[in-house]
Amino acid sequence: MNLADVPKEKLSPGMRQYADLKEKYQDCILFFRLGDFYEMFFEDAILVSRELELTLTGKECGLEERAPMCGVPYHSVDLYLKRLIDRGYKIAICEQLTDPALSKGLVERDVIRIVTPGTLIDSTMLEDDSNNYICCLYYGNDGSCALCFADISTGEMSLAVPQETSDLTVRIIDLLSRYMPAELILNSQAMSLKSVMDFIRVRLQCTVTVREDTCFDLEQGRGTLCEQFGVSSLCLLYTSDAADDTPCVD
């Protein structure tokens, strides 16, 4: 039973709350807090029960058929998150925002964080002897290209700007090989770099998210970085005069 095929108006209030949140985070597994457990329903429950070898049960949801359900205890959730992250999944953590004992109606809930392979900061989920990079790759219609690597757990960030040449894809693959990111975000035009995409699929095997080119606005990105680091110009972040594939921002 897929949630997208279910008439939302027929769902119980609690399950409708779950459906509304799941609609906002369709690319994530939704961990929905119910008391002392994080529960998953419908296709998420089927997926997680298979990946983690959990018992698949059912829950009344307002339909004739019970919604597939599985869950994990909140006090040991990190163990389960780590196993899913290692398999490349993204998880949206939904918490109870009001006290169930004091709530007269439906407990207020919302997603408070999203856990992905490249955004881990919890030391229990990280390897002690290696970095955990997330990479953003942009490739423009005019041949412009840039890659940014960040290890959010340490604050390390590097930028590389390979120049348009006949071996551009080789340079991109070399950079990806050096950093071996756990997660990759790229624009839709970058999908046209066939050898790069083959390398990502076969060698990196990391979590990949494709965003529309409109998400890669240069001025907006420049302003966000200046605000984040408290500088008036990004030139103040440069640590080298590199103009090719040598990382030039630290």
What residue ranges belong to the model's regions?
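Basic, polar low-complexity surface loops/patches
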Residues: 1-240
